[in-house]
Regions:
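Domain-level detector of nuclease and nuclease-like folds
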Residues: 64-150
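Short, solvent-exposed loop/turn elements at domain surfaces
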Residues: 58-62
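N-terminal module-boundary/linker segments of secreted carbohydrate-active enzymes
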Residues: 1-57
Length: 150
């Protein structure tokens, strides 16, 4: 907990003491290992819950580079191509605050589209409450808060 402080250098020092000693995870396997814990389905601990669709998917169906359907992968809410350092070995590229388990096909459709309200557009087949156009992606309402806080 944060002790009572008046601000300035004292506050900065107190915050530093709280976060000092954190551990950075590797992109592979670190982020994968974290997602199976962070996005675990509380009703079926062998599965992860996927962002955008809310589906529960077996942890064992982690994308291994195949073209198989039903696999899940790592969705970066802030796309690497939109200003994140493209080196996933950097801290930004593996920041667990904005990486979630996602259906690999949904992730591919979202690509690097910005989040926005979408009227019309297409319904995502694997995430039917999410919609997209060629210029924007609107996640289902149940995920908007998570995304906003990421």
């Amino acid at each position: 907990t944060l002790p009572p402080v008046t601000g300035g250098a004292t506050l900065k020092s107190a915050l530093h003491d709280i976060i000092d000693g954190h551990s950075a995870v590797s992109y592979t396997p670190g982020v994968w290992n974290a997602l199976v814990v962070l996005d675990e389905d509380a009703t079926n601990t062998a599965n992860v819950l996927l962002i955008y669709g809310g589906d529960s998917r077996a942890k064992s169906l982690q994308d291994n580079g195949t073209n198989s359907a039903n696999y899940w992968n790592r969705e970066h809410l802030w796309p690497v191509s939109r200003g994140m350092n493209s080196d996933t070995g950097t801290l930004g590229g593996r920041d667990l605050h904005h990486i979630f388990a996602s259906d690999k096909d949904v992730n591919a459709r979202r690509a690097n589209l910005p989040f926005d309200e979408v009227s019309g557009g297409s319904t995502d087949p694997e995430a039917p409450l999410s919609r997209y156009t060629s210029s924007a992606y609107e996640p289902r309402d149940a995920d908007k808060g998570r995304i906003a806080r990421a």
